[in-house]
Amino acid sequence: DETEMPLMRIEGDTVYYANPQSAPVSFKVVHDTIYIYSNEPVAYKIDRQTEYSFWFHSLADEVIKLHKSENAEDSLVFTSREVEVISTTPEVIKKDSIVIYKNTRYRGYVYINPSKMKVFKTSYSENGISVDNVYYDNVIHICVYEGKKMLYGQDITKKMFADIFPAEILNQAILADMNFMGVDSKGYHYQATLGIPESSVYSLVNMIIGFDCTMSIEKAE
């Protein structure tokens, strides 16, 4: 009620947000509660529900007061139904490193490739309202060369880390970075970075590719 700016549009059982980067979500009203089925489902207590107004308690325990718009032009904000997906890596990033092990020179390559795989991350406004933003994940190609001979090459996706991260963390993370760390008696060492988009939260993963091309993966301490 404090602004005339359109915030959301209700159509059927779906909420469409004015922010093009926020994904639409389904909802259901049961008695005095509205359930929002976003990436992280939430429930809000309804304080008032009439034909022209809707008040509810946010997760921050604030009363959010919404009113039905009487301005037909407000619907123009919702003309596009395409969610604006946020690209975390606009273009391919190439990195290479050279290491010497037992008088042999190795070159490790990393190619961070933007993909069309979508990651849904739930964020919360200062008022305690949740919205889902959508990001593109990356596929990272790694390879190791001795001179012109390729010793190892593989595409890495975050799905490969499903055994060491809970699904609720992995689902909201992107494969953000990768570094070639070196070569030793165990094999070729890489370190991957899994991060939550637009936050400082990240985890490191150590990857060792043995000389027989088998891979071991573990969380970095």
Model-predicted regions and their roles:
Residues D1-P6, S80-K94:
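Tryptophan-anchored aromatic micro-motifs
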Residues E2-P41, D132-K148:
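N-terminal glycine/threonine-rich, aromatic-flanked beta-hairpin/loop signature
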Residues P6-I10, V25-V29, Y44-R48, I98, ...:
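Short, exposed beta-strand/loop patches in secreted or surface proteins that constitute
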Residues V30-D61:
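Mid-chain, structured segments of secreted extracytoplasmic proteins
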Residues F54-F56, Y101-S115, S125-V131, K186-I196:
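Short beta-strand elements that form the blades of beta-propeller/WD-repeat-like
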Residues F54-S58, L194-D212:
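Short, exposed beta-strand-loop hairpins at the edges of beta-sheets
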Residues C143-F165, N206-M215:
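Surface-exposed loop/turn elements that mediate protein-protein interactions on large endomembrane-trafficking
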Residues M160-S200:
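Acidic, glycine-rich flexible loop segments
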